[in-house]
């Protein structure tokens, strides 16, 4: 055991581990942990999410026993407290260009077609994607042992594919013996059609079922393709049964996909995580990061000006930077607000005269809370539904001008039920940071359907 008279036992443990793990692992899993209270009997730690707790105990339990107090059973006497989501300015990890991973001859069939730019260390984190990034890191660190499958859903251009490929890179670098395959749903279907045509379907089945990690992008393209859906579901179930990790992305949560109940149930087995529309601070961080990659120096006030007008998704922000960079270089123009306005006027969103509707609110709330729209308008008391229904009523009262009676009618409720729901949510958001963040995500999503600026 290391000793240090000026260090607490936790600090001694951290200093010890820092020299024995990679910089990335330390920054992702150890550095975020904060000591709340330390005594001879136990240590109380604040962690950003439950994945950090699992990673710490799974990988460093023996080391912990050498430094921290132990309980009666000889286990580390640690108490974990999950911190509230903080809306601080997003941090940008330094982007490091890494060499392509070499694949041995025997694993050539499993060579990954991963985008080298999509890694965890250059994924811009903010309140809208903090949870899903932690989930992706958690399963990448412990494939097949955490949440399986991991189902990532969200709108176009919000980072789903980035996270999918980041999982692939991380697993390849930290679990070198695992067989990994990353594929789009369309490519899976084409692969299946090919093997059916040449009568080698068993070869395809053997390939997919020998994988340790399967990464599938855009599962929504499996809709209305019943025969292909059945084969995918069979492969899916086999891998899950063998504790092989699966990660799936989609533009909708499982319950909103037009797939069989069987496959929807399988998708919901593990963890369903939503990637939301980035808030203003996150959009600014993304813009500055993209501009830095292009060699464009973008002042804070210009970044905020662009982010305030381009707020649909990350691809639009990247397109804005590409257009600005080209314009400034070709015409030798300085980067001013006038230059930005003239160059990006086609991208800039203007407040719409279209009113927010109850339907757009229901769609957004259903996506964030992972429930069905019909349940929000019905009497279901299933998990998440009552709270989501109250949030939808609260947003309807807040964002549209209809009377309480009209809002109640849209939900099949009385005006007094709407009033009760609004008061309940107003009280809860004062104490519940997670709920407050979920409501913010709902508003961001509504803004995409009915572009307006919400305070």
UniProtKB/Swiss-Prot annotation:
Question: Which InterPro entries does the record cross-reference, listed alphabetically?
Answer: AAA+_ATPase, Chromosome_initiator_DnaA, Chromosome_initiator_DnaA-like, Chromosome_initiator_DnaA_CS, DnaA_C, DnaA_dom, DnaA_N_dom, DnaA_N_sf
Its domain of life?
A: Bacteria
Give any GO molecular function from the UniProt entry.
ATP hydrolysis activity
| Region annotated Domain IV, binds dsDNA, chain positions | 329-455
Residue ranges of region Domain I, interacts with DnaA modulators? 1-95
Gene Ontology cellular component terms for the protein in this record: cytoplasm; plasma membrane
Task: Cite the entry's keywords alphabetically.
Answer: ATP-binding, Cytoplasm, DNA replication, DNA-binding, Lipid-binding, Nucleotide-binding
Q: Which CDD domains match?
A: AAA, Bac_DnaA_C
Give the signal sequence positions: none
Q: Where is this region: Domain III, AAA+ region?
A: 113-328
Which residue ranges are recorded for the region named Domain II? 96-112
A Pfam family this chain is assigned to: Hda_lid
Subcellular location, record wording: Cytoplasm
What's any GO biological process attached to this entry? regulation of DNA replication
Summarize where ATP binds, as residue positions.
Answer: 157, 159-161
Query: Has keyword Kinase?
Result: no
Quaternary organization? Oligomerizes as a right-handed, spiral filament on DNA at oriC.
Which family would the database say this protein is a member of? Belongs to the DnaA family.
Q: What does this protein do?
A: Plays an essential role in the initiation and regulation of chromosomal replication. ATP-DnaA binds to the origin of replication (oriC) to initiate formation of the DNA replication initiation complex once per cell cycle. Binds the DnaA box (a 9 base pair repeat at the origin) and separates the double-stranded (ds)DNA. Forms a right-handed helical filament on oriC DNA; dsDNA binds to the exterior of the filament while single-stranded (ss)DNA is stabiized in the filament's interior.
- Entry's free-text remark on domains: Domain I is involved in oligomerization and binding regulators, domain II is flexibile and of varying length in different bacteria, domain III forms the AAA+ region, while domain IV binds dsDNA.
Q: What is this protein called?
A: Chromosomal replication initiator protein DnaA 2
Q: Which gene encodes it?
A: dnaA2
């Amino acid at each position: 055991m290391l000793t240090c008279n000026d260090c607490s036992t936790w600090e001694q443990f951290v200093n010890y581990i820092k020299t024995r793990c990679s910089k990335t692992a330390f920054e992702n899993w150890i550095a975020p942990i904060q000591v709340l209270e330390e005594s001879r009997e136990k240590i109380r730690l604040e962690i950003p999410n439950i994945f950090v707790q699992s990673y710490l105990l799974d990988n460093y339990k023996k080391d912990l026993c050498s430094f921290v107090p132990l309980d009666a059973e000889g286990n580390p006497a640690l108490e974990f407290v999950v911190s509230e989501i903080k809306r601080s300015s997003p941090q940008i990890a330094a982007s490091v260009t890494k060499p392509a991973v070499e694949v041995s001859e025997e694993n050539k069939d499993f060579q990954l077609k991963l985008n080298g730019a999509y890694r965890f260390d250059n994924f811009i984190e903010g309140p809208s994607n903090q949870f899903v990034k932690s989930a992706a890191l958690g399963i990448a660190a412990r494939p097949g042992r955490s949440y399986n499958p991991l189902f990532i859903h969200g709108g176009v251009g919000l980072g789903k594919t980035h996270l999918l490929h980041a999982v692939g890179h991380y697993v390849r670098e930290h679990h070198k013996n695992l067989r990994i395959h990353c594929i789009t749903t369309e490519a899976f279907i084409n692969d299946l059609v090919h093997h059916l045509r040449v009568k080698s379907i068993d070869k395809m089945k053997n390939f997919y079922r020998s994988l340790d990690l399967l990464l599938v992008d855009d599962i929504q393209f499996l809709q209305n393709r019943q025969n292909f859906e059945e084969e995918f579901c069979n492969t899916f179930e086999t891998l899950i049964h063998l504790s092989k990790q699966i990660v799936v992305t989609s533009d909708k949560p499982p319950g909103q996909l037009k797939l069989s109940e069987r496959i929807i149930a399988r998708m919901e087995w593990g963890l369903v995580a939503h990637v939301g529309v980035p808030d203003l601070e996150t959009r600014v961080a993304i813009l500055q990061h993209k501009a830095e990659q292009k060699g464009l120096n973008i002042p804070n006030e210009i970044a905020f000006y662009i982010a305030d007008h381009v707020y649909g998704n990350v691809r639009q922000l990247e397109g804005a930077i590409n257009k600005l960079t080209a314009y400034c270089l070709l015409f030798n123009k300085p980067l001013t607000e006038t230059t930005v306005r003239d160059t990006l006027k086609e991208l800039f969103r203007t407040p719409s005269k279209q009113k927010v509707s109850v339907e757009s609110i229901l769609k957004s709330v259903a996506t964030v809370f992972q429930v069905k729209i019909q349940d929000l308008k019905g009497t279901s008391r299933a998990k998440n539904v009552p709270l989501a229904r109250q949030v939808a009523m609260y947003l309807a009262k807040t964002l549209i001008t209809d009377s309480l009676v009209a809002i109640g009618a849209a939900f099949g409720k009385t005006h007094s039920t709407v009033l009760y729901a609004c008061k309940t949510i107003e009280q809860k958001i004062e104490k519940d940071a997670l709920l407050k963040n979920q409501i913010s995500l709902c508003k961001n999503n509504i803004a995409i359907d009915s572009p307006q600026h919400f305070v």
